[in-house]
A protein has these predicted regions:
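Alpha-helical transmembrane bundles and membrane-interface segments of multipass inner-membrane proteins
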Residues: 1-179
Length: 179
């Protein structure tokens, strides 16, 4: 029980840090960047440019922002429930990144213009000409990698039942040889 509480605390701390950093960088982006100008960081590969995303990843579903918000709330609640059952610290950290990223983007959907529940997510990390994202999106990716690592570590610890030797039957007492 104590380990479960510790892992839940790890998840909550990671999620809180992700939310704070995500919302802080979005505020900074809103105050310093423009939609019509890109600041290159690594050539044309990575830059800073303000964008507002009414949809999901790659702006999919941009006409259904309220649906994305409702689905996002449900998925986030399910993730928090799953996170409380994390089996190891890697899983707790992974769920923390994912929950923090999901909540970071939900805050935008709930409280950013144009209106409550249909707000646009603030994006500012321009990946070439592919898409523009934010640190919540990065946290979602990091969390997924952590969960994969946790799964690989767990599967390595569990021996394959097929590889276990058959149990040895004890020799019946009447067949025991006495010197």
């Amino acid at each position: 029980m104590r380990d479960r509480v510790r892992r839940s605390a790890v998840m909550l701390i990671v999620a809180a840090i992700v939310i704070l950093i995500d919302q802080g960088t979005k505020t900074l982006a809103l105050n310093t960047l423009r939609q019509d100008a890109r600041i290159p960081l690594i050539g044309d590969w990575l830059g800073l440019q303000l964008a507002f995303n009414p949809g999901a990843i790659f702006s999919l579903g941009e006409g259904s922002t309220w649906v994305i918000t409702v689905v996002g709330l449900a998925v986030t609640a399910a993730l928090i429930g799953a996170a409380t059952r994390a089996r190891n610290v890697w899983s707790a950290v992974g769920f923390g990144f994912i929950v923090g990223g999901a909540i970071g983007n939900l805050i935008d959907r709930l409280f950013s213009p144009p209106a409550f529940g249909i707000g646009h997510v603030t994006d500012f990390l321009a990946y070439g000409n592919l898409f523009i994202g934010n640190l919540a999106d990065v946290a979602l990716g990091i969390g997924a990698v952590c969960l994969i690592v946790a799964g690989l570590r767990t599967s390595r610890r569990r021996p394959d039942p097929a590889s276990r030797p058959d149990p040895v039957d004890p020799v019946p007492a009447e067949e025991t040889v006495h010197p």
